[in-house]
Amino acid sequence: MRDRDRLLAAFSKDTGITLKPEQIAMIEAYTGLLLDYNQRVNLTAITDREEIWRKHVLDSLLLFLALEIPPAAKVIDIGTGAGIPGLILKIYRPDLEMALLESQNKKVAFLKKAVATLGLQGIECLWGRAEDIGRQKNYRESFDLAVSRGLAGMNTLAEYCLPFVRVGGFMIAYKGPGGEGELNAAARAIEILGGGTKKVWRGSLTGGQEVRQLIIIQKEHPTPPVYPRRPGLPAKRPLQ
């Protein structure tokens, strides 16, 4: 715990983001549940508690440095896996109306267990593919923000995320040092899908040297009805 507390103190000094004791307790409970489930379901390759804090929890929170999120914003985490970053964002900002979208049912079962265990309200766990859910009236162009971490390249990710975002809203992709290059290569695809203004936030993970880029895209036009294409196509044949 001393290592964790030192890490949190350093993160707070670096970013100005400070977790409350009750939030730390909730994330510790989540971490315990994650490691227990991970013995049966492949949720994370990181099994050291301090590294979970550093590479999953604190990394997720960098979003709040990249973009000001208004109160009670509607947020969807696409390809959330074990709930990263969406679950962490919700714990830090309980006012957010959060949806966690995951295509693997076993992982959705874990997410539902985690949400129930932590007593979180205003959070929905969705089982399905972005290509299908993004066409449903209840979800299409209804979110202020769509986020995704480590799911796909920017061409593909834009087709997964932008159909969920309302005009004027944003998508944010968590990327490493190659993020800006991916963004440049995906410029036309982003424009086709309704994206407009683009920005790159640059930083690094507290306690390490890993470079982090958050790709921020504002949606300026409705996504054409033909997108997203049928399941599998955005990954197999990314828009160019």
Swiss-Prot record:
Principal location listed in the UniProt entry: cytoplasm
Superkingdom, taxonomy of origin: Bacteria
Function: Specifically methylates the N7 position of a guanine in 16S rRNA.
Keyword S-adenosyl-L-methionine: yes
Binding site for S-adenosyl-L-methionine: G79, A130, E131, R149
Native source organism of the sequence: Moorella thermoacetica (strain ATCC 39073 / JCM 9320)
Protein name per Swiss-Prot or TrEMBL: Ribosomal RNA small subunit methyltransferase G
Matches recorded under PANTHER family: S-ADENOSYL-L-METHIONINE-DEPENDENT METHYLTRANSFERASES SUPERFAMILY PROTEIN
Keywords of this entry: Cytoplasm, Methyltransferase, rRNA processing, S-adenosyl-L-methionine, Transferase
Gene Ontology CC terms: cytosol
Listed InterPro entries: rRNA_ssu_MeTfrase_G, SAM-dependent_MTases_sf
